[in-house]
Amino acid sequence: MITDLTKEHPNKTLWRFLLPMLFSVMFQQIYNIADSMIAGRFAGEDALAAVGASYPITIIFMAFAVGMNLGASVVVSRLFGAEDRGGVKCAVTTAFISSMVLGIILTLFGYFFNHQMMRWIRTPQNIMADGVLYLKIYIFGIIFLMLYNVCTGVFTALGDSKTPLYFLLGSSAGNIILDYIFVAKFQWGVSGVAWATFIAQGVSAVLALVTLLGRLQKFAGKEKQSWFDKKLFAQIMAIAIPSILQQSVLSVGNLFVQGIVNQFGSAVVAGYSGAIKLNTFAINIFMTLGSCLSSYTAQNIGAGKKERIPLGFRTGVKLSELTALPFVILYFIFSRQMMGLFLGAESVEAISAGMAFLKIVSPWYFMIVIKLMTDGIIRGSGAMVYFVVATVPDLILRIGFALVLTKSFGSTGIWMAWPFGWIVATTLTLIFYRKLGYKNDKSSNF
């Protein structure tokens, strides 16, 4: 269902729009966590560590998919808000063509350099072979990853957050079932985990594409539209490239962090792998709220209703703080039980490392959600320079403090670096939000 985000009060509009997106992300993260749970429980601690060691590299590829998602979403949102239906259709096909070309390039790069990338992050030798195997299979699904993310970006831009949910419900269930069959029954190890993800991702991408192409039949303009428009391509990439750079910088930072973690051995890597999956689960939920605000902001700018943006920002922050509360309680108080999802009681060192991460990082969710909501407004406004600049200090501080603190606190020092980066990044995004001028409206006092 297509939803106009420019009319009703943000409290009602954002909440109704958000719920299906939240469920979508939750199910997506559940099957990501299921990979690690099944790997750890049925293939062993080393298998969990191997999947976890390759994770920061997969996030680099994800950065490109997310960038194209944002580029398509913001441009389509503006055209939809301006009621340019023909432009919407052309923007979508332009985004598809661009993402497919990019996907092919990334696949070729990943295929030829996967082993080198695993060596760059100093992957422990006992998990190197499994890590490379997982990464090779994952790389074959990059085109599906790009395709699915562009589709979901367009659905979100049109105010339809329910359709992606339906795809994810099916693919999440299928992924978990295939994980169990391939790993627990067939004993395929990490390759079973990778193939399960590949199949689930492929099915979701194809279903999303077929459904979206059907919807586009209703968006015929007065004049015949081309399949690829250079001007729209430039607009999409103006949003996508800074986002890709920002996400890539973060991903490279995560590679450095993974390299530091890897020096402490496979047990700490396994603990970190489980904890970072839980952390990513929470962060992606919060980022979904930010994505809602991006679509909300872009649609209202396209409709000439900028005065609605500050109220939407306040609503988003309130919702995100409420969303953060259960994660903080769960991860801080029940950290041992959370790590027990991935590892058996015999993995004492790994569980201890994961618990330390969760207890140190989770209380700061109340701060990082403010940054992520502000990011949503900034992206929707097209101010991508601000979006990128606010990320770099977070990365530098996180790596710098990790290197320094590990000398005194061991692996725990790595986890302690997270809050320092988040404090600076949140402060910067709030400064940039004020520079956009939306705070000048009397209704926008925050």
State where each predicted segment sits.
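Small-residue hotspots at the loop-to-helix junctions and early N-terminal turns
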Residues: 43-56, 131, 135, 194, ...
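Helix-terminus/linker motif at the lipid-water interface of multi-pass membrane proteins
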Residues: 26, 30-48, 118-125, 181-188, ...
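Small-residue-rich hydrophobic transmembrane alpha-helices
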Residues: 48-108, 145-164, 271-335, 368-382, ...
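N-terminal transmembrane alpha-helices
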Residues: 5-42, 56-71, 75, 100-107, ...
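Transmembrane helical elements of multi-pass membrane transporters/channels
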Residues: 16-35, 137, 148, 171, ...
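Generic alpha-helical transmembrane segments of integral inner-membrane proteins
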Residues: 22, 26, 30, 34, ...
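Short alpha-helical transmembrane segments in multi-pass integral membrane proteins
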Residues: 1-18, 76-141, 185-241, 297-363, ...
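Short runs within selected transmembrane alpha-helices of multi-pass transporters and secretion channels
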Residues: 69, 138-156, 164-175, 193-208, ...
